[in-house]
UniProtKB/Swiss-Prot annotation:
It comes from Methanocorpusculum labreanum (strain ATCC 43576 / DSM 4855 / Z). Keywords: Coenzyme M biosynthesis, Pyridoxal phosphate, Transferase. Homotrimer. This is Cysteate synthase. NCBIfam families: cysteate_syn. InterPro entries: Cysteate_synthase (IPR022401), TrpB-like_PALP (IPR001926), TrpB-like_PALP_sf (IPR036052). One of its GO terms (molecular function) is pyridoxal phosphate binding. Pathway: Cofactor biosynthesis; coenzyme M biosynthesis. The modification N6-(pyridoxal phosphate)lysine is found at K105. Its EC number is 2.5.1.76. It catalyses: O-phospho-L-serine + sulfite + H(+) = L-cysteate + phosphate. Its cofactor is pyridoxal 5'-phosphate. Specifically catalyzes the beta-elimination of phosphate from L-phosphoserine and the beta-addition of sulfite to the dehydroalanine intermediate to produce L-cysteate.
């Protein structure tokens, strides 16, 4: 399962994988090339590991966390799109979704901890605006993998676990600053021996874990969708969708055309949208005017990465150029309306603010006629069901280990 080689996208050379995040000789992403050219969905394996053929792991851990793809006829009628498919990764038992932290970030955390343990283990250092940190905290509480979570001070209340309450392997460090400041602090922690960065977009386990959304969608629909909608902060989910599509096209059973990527950001913080619409392969300061105030004003704080892998080889720009598509800006009020519409159609389920941004962009595209009626559309609902989790499961907040200023290194 998951046999692969690791290839540098810039230089083309094959690298040894020792939880390798980057090529030592070239900038740009590395990518897993799997021995299995056709995907076998392994129903006997738990959760997301059913897609182990295309995950960079040999084994698995017990889990029910996986994406689930379905249709809602009411939403299809509302949008005038009869072939709208929703891939939901969250907590929604009526739809067979049992992700305890409510976020698709568990699709990244699960293969990452298995990959690290198979490479010899260590302490993972995770910078997060909330959802990623919660996913890795859940994995740490369940499986004992030591983690250091580094989050903005304002995100501390988003860090909790469901059903598992031993937090002895978790150190939560809060930073007086934003998500990018948390990343800088995490990088400094990783300079000490025994501490390993989870890697963000550079981590093939994270990207290929997220790519399982596209895999589940294509397997359920029976082919690749024409359009793929997701909200992005780092843009790694869009990259993951592109890479999964490359593999599905290579499989030969799901079509030969890339899905268009329709990616969205939350106004007023929309640096990638500005760069893409200007035709640039890089982000400039003018794409983030008054960044701190803009970050404070969004409803989806997980979408506020100031240093996304946009122009890097294998990054967001390359994904968009390969697949085609559009980028959207979404106002808070439109995201809130989209969330209400989803809840009305789906048993009151609350979707993540980022997922609401994605859904709002789809509503806008349908209203403006920028997507073809009757086309197969895949909407990535990246999280939801938080109220149900807290109703059905006991949850425990993670205590803060230390609060630091930007760039300050905590004593661990």
């Amino acid at each position: 399962m998951g046999d692969y080689v690791l290839r540098c996208l810039t230089g083309g050379e094959v690298l040894e994988d020792h939880y390798t995040l980057a090529c030592p000789h070239h900038p740009g992403f590395v990518r897993a090339e799997y021995t299995a050219k056709q995907l076998t969905v392994r129903e006997n394996l738990p959760g997301v590991f059913r897609f182990s053929d295309w995950l960079p792991v040999r084994g698995s851990v017990p889990t029910r966390s996986r994406p689930v793809t379905f249709q809602n006829r009411e939403l299809c009628r509302e949008l005038g799109q009869p072939n709208l498919w929703i891939t939901f990764t969250g907590y929604y038992p009526e739809r067979g979704c049992y992700v305890p932290t409510g976020s698709f970030k568990e699709l990244e955390a699960l293969p990452t901890i298995v990959r690290l343990n198979e490479a010899g283990g260590g302490t993972l250092v995770v910078a997060s605006a909330g959802n990623t940190g919660r996913a890795f905290a859940q994995m740490s509480a369940e499986f004992g993998t030591p983690v250091v979570l580094v989050v903005p001070e304002s995100s501390a209340d988003k860090l909790w676990t469901a059903g598992y309450f031993d937090h002895s392997s978790i150190r939560l460090v809060t930073v007086r600053g934003d998500y990018t400041d948390a990343i800088k602090t995490a990088d400094k922690i990783c300079e000490a021996p025994g501490f390993f960065p989870e890697g963000g977009g550079k981590n093939i386990a994270r990207r290929d874990g997220m790519g399982c959304v596209m895999l589940d969608g294509a397997v359920t629909i029976g082919k690749l969708p024409e359009y793929y909608f997701q909200a992005v902060g780092s843009g790694t989910g869009g990259i993951a969708a592109w890479e999964a599509a490359i593999r599905l096209i290579g499989d030969g059973r799901f079509g030969s055309k890339f899905p268009e990527l329709h990616l969205s950001q939350n106004l007023p913080f929309v640096p990638m949208v500005r760069a893409w619409n200007a035709g640039r392969d890089h982000i400039i300061d003018e794409d983030m005017p008054d960044a701190q105030a803009s970050i404070s004003a969004v409803s989806a704080h997980v979408l506020t990465n100031r240093t996304p892998p946009y122009g890097i080889c294998g990054g967001v720009y390359d994904a968009m150029k390969s697949c085609g598509g559009q980028m959207y800006t979404v106002e808070n009020k439109d995201a809130a309306s989209a969330a209400s519409l989803f809840a009305e159609a789906e048993n009151g389920i609350d979707i993540d603010p980022a997922a609401a941004v994605a859904f709002a962009s789809l509503i806008s595209a349908a209203e403006e006629g920028s997507i073809r009626t009757n086309a197969d559309i895949l909407l990535n609902i990246t999280g939801g069901g938080y109220q149900r989790v807290k109703k059905d499961c006991e949850t425990a907040k993670i205590g803060v280990y230390e609060t630091v200023d930007t760039g300050e290194v905590p004593v661990l």
